[in-house]
């Protein structure tokens, strides 16, 4: 199987952590769309949003998704990539989409423990726990709509990877 694997889900669900380890295990290339975009523009996501607003960032995110999609690649996407209909169809039609699902409490704990998350601009201007709750309520149905596979991401990365591998084996053998 050489189809790209798209990891989707909210901030803090483990897309980058799981994606890097999964790519290594499957001998695939790993790309994080946010990191790729930041390296291309030599700007942080916050700087891009400040300069171009969220609409400009979302347009660049779509271009990044198209640019990094290639066979034998694990792609960790930005949490809001599913907000654009084109992106949802593109991922569904060009690879296998894995939704790393986790409850608000887990996401908030992970985000509070990750100092680099302070570099991300707020989506709502609200306290973190309220923002995560609101954003997840808005996006969960979209994540589920686009996903070929839904994985409980509350477990340790090694367990999440094991569950992804099992689900991929079942998907391929259908």
Curated annotation (Swiss-Prot):
Positions of the UniProt region annotated as LID domain: 112-126
GO cellular component: a single term: cytosol
Cellular location(s): Cytoplasm
SUPFAM superfamilies assigned to the protein according to its UniProt record, in alphabetical order: P-loop containing nucleoside triphosphate hydrolases
Enzyme Commission number(s) of this protein: 2.7.1.71
Keywords attached to this entry: Amino-acid biosynthesis, Aromatic amino acid biosynthesis, ATP-binding, Cytoplasm, Kinase, Magnesium, Metal-binding, Nucleotide-binding, Transferase
Listed GO MF terms: ATP binding; magnesium ion binding; shikimate kinase activity
GO BP term, pick one: aromatic amino acid family biosynthetic process
Catalytic activity as recorded in UniProt: shikimate + ATP = 3-phosphoshikimate + ADP + H(+)
InterPro entries listed in its UniProt record: P-loop_NTPase, Shikimate/glucono_kinase, Shikimate_kinase/TSH1, Shikimate_kinase_2, Shikimate_kinase_CS
Any matching Pfam family: SKI
CDD domains: SK
Comment text on domains: The LID domain closes over the active site upon ATP binding.
PANTHER family named in the record: SHIKIMATE KINASE, SHIKIMATE KINASE 2
Subunit structure: Monomer.
Functional note: Catalyzes the specific phosphorylation of the 3-hydroxyl group of shikimic acid using ATP as a cosubstrate.
Protein name, entry field: Shikimate kinase 2
Origin organism lineage: Bacteria, Pseudomonadati, Pseudomonadota, Gammaproteobacteria, Enterobacterales
Protein's gene: aroL
């Amino acid at each position: 199987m050489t189809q790209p694997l798209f990891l989707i889900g909210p901030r803090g669900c483990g897309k980058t952590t799981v994606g890097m380890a999964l790519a290594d295990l499957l001998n695939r290339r790993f790309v994080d769309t946010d990191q790729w975009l930041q390296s291309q523009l030599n700007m942080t996501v916050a700087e891009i949003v400040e300069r171009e607003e969220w609409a400009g960032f979302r347009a660049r995110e779509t271009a990044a998704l198209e640019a990094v999609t290639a066979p034998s690649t694990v792609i960790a996407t930005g949490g809001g990539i599913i907000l654009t209909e084109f992106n949802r169809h593109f991922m569904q039609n060009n690879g296998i989409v894995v939704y790393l699902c986790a409850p608000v409490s887990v996401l908030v704990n992970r985000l509070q423990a990750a100092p680099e998350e302070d570099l991300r601009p707020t989506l709502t201007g609200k306290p973190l726990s309220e923002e995560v709750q609101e954003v997840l309520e808005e996006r969960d149905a979209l994540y589920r709509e686009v996903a070929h596979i839904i994985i409980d991401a509350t477990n340790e990365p090694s367990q999440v990877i094991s569950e992804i591998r099992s689900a991929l084996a079942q998907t391929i053998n259908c």
